[in-house]
Swiss-Prot record:
Quaternary assembly: Component of the ASTRA chromatin remodeling machinery complex composed of at least RVB1, RVB2, TRA1, TEL2, TT1 and TTI2. Component of the TTT complex composed of TEL2, TTI1 and TTI2. Interacts with TEL2 and TTI1.
Function noted in UniProt: Component of the ASTRA complex probably in chromatin remodeling.
GO cellular component term, pick one: nucleus
Protein localization: Cytoplasm; Nucleus
The organism of origin for this protein: Saccharomyces cerevisiae (strain ATCC 204508 / S288c) (Baker's yeast)
Family according to the record: Belongs to the TTI2 family.
Keywords: Chromatin regulator, Cytoplasm, Nucleus
Single biological process term from Gene Ontology: DNA damage response
Hydrolase listed as a keyword: no
Protein name listed in UniProt: TEL2-interacting protein 2
Note: Present with 1470 molecules/cell in log phase SD medium.
Domain of life, source organism: Eukaryota
Length: 421
């Protein structure tokens, strides 16, 4: 079997193929299974070399789970040396970090008032370009792996370099996908894999005590407005897929002990970002954006449960005005299905009495969808079944619409819809 030092050399070869990387990961995991001896020094070098392959170097953020699994194997096999390994990895990472903001500057930045300084943007862009040209991007995957394995008890002693390191990447204006968005990924990892561990143990520092919430929230919310035509739709969706989950994690960690504030910020995000901006602007012109917005809508509805009632009237209006009423609605079967799924979710999570109050508005969304599809030869078995199921959910709320539904069911155009098995 190949020696660990030879594998490290191969991992550091810039021409290493993805196929060969998988083979090396398999070999390394077999070494752990057989209890093959390895020095701490070699283990550190191995984890470092593997870490550089944990995130793809291209524009799209692709996490290599094979590499992460292999790294985890080596951390697990040598738990007693975990702290020593992490200490060395951190010392290897720090020289690779972009050094643009000091702790003093971060404190100043928490004052969110506008303080323009002539020429600063150009100076910072030049610093970023120099950092990239010197191979600075190489440090981001290592940063990511360190955050994945950093223990909760070690956060406070490392925040002095973690926070500036993440913010300096987040503040980039030169390359959204390859730099700025990777900063969002690092923040998400910090929130999900460090601050969310041992959340009930008061002896460890809480995220809310750092005072960084407004700074991170402002940056993330601004990225939600990277919309067409200023940005390509594919670029926008790639940004949202990282930013939206990070915003939810940020709210969860910041308001861990304040459920009311957590719900308020989810409600604000849904109202201001999704219902007032994304869906009206994307509509059917950018199907993939609207599909993702509707998927996020369902996730927030499930998180808010009965609290979703605050969105009921607005959501019904937005679905009807910007999606269902669109004359090209029936040419987007995925959008039809997702819209019906949102309506079903809304019915399930909101209090029955509020659904009853809006029963005819909700019924109209279903009927118009069904009727349009039927009239325009777009009604397939899947859509028909979804329409029937959504009506069933509505009826389960004791909506007392027997007379109206009986009249509708006698109309030839709606007979198929009301044929329940």
């Amino acid at each position: 079997m190949t020696a660990v030092t030879d594998i490290i050399d191969e991992l550091n070869d810039s021409s290493l193929s993805s196929t060969r990387l998988r083979e090396l990961c398999l070999q390394l995991r077999k070494k752990t299974d057989t209890g093959c001896a390895i020095t701490v020094s070699d283990e550190v070098n191995l984890i470092e070399s593997l870490s550089y392959h944990s995130i793809s170097p291209g524009v799209d953020i692709q996490i290599n789970t094979d590499v992460l699994q292999t790294i985890d194997y080596y951390f697990q096999r040598n738990k007693s040396e975990h702290d020593e390994i992490m200490c060395v990895l951190i010392s290897k990472l720090q020289p690779l970090l972009l050094k643009r903001k000091s702790n003093f500057e971060l404190k100043e930045q928490r004052n969110l008032g506008l303080k323009p300084t002539l020429g600063m943007s150009l100076k910072e862009d030049n610093l970023m370009q120099a950092w990239v040209s010197q191979g600075g991007l190489k440090g981001i995957p290592l940063f990511y792996v360190i955050l994945l394995h950093l223990k909760r008890r070690d956060i406070s002693t490392n925040l002095s370099w973690i926070i500036p390191g993440i913010l300096n990447i987040l503040d980039d204006t030169t390359d959204i996908r390859r730099i700025k968005l990777r900063g969002v990924l690092l923040l998400q990892t910090l929130l999900n894999h460090t601050f969310m561990n041992e959340t009930n143990d008061s002896k460890w520092i809480q995220f809310s005590s750092t005072g960084l919430f407004p700074l991170f929230e402002k940056t993330l919310i601004n990225m939600c407005y990277f919309l067409p035509p200023s940005y390509n739709a594919d670029e926008t969706i790639a940004i949202w897929r990282v930013v939206f989950p990070t915003i939810q994690s940020l709210y969860k960690v910041e308001f861990l002990d304040n459920y009311t504030k957590y719900q308020y910020h989810l409600e604000k995000f849904m109202s201001e970002i999704i219902l007032q901006n994304i869906i009206p602007r994307a509509s059917l012109a950018y199907e993939n954006l609207t599909l993702y917005a509707l998927e996020c809508t369902m996730n927030i509805l499930r998180l808010q449960r009965e609290g979703s009632v605050v969105h009921l009237q607005r959501l019904i209006f937005v679905l009807g005005e910007y999606i269902v009423r669109n004359p090209f609605y029936t040419t987007f079967p995925k959008l039809i299905s997702k819209t019906l799924s949102v309506v079903s979710t809304l019915i399930k999570v909101c209090p029955n009495e509020r659904i009853v109050a809006h029963r005819f508005d909700i019924l109209s969304l279903i009927l118009v969808t069904y009727d349009k599809c039927s009239q325009e030869d777009a009604l397939n078995e899947s859509i028909l079944q979804q329409c029937k199921e959504t009506i069933s959910w509505l009826l389960n709320c004791d909506c007392a619409m027997g007379e109206q539904l009986s009249t509708l069911s006698k109309q030839p155009r709606f007979q198929l819809l009301f044929e329940f098995s």
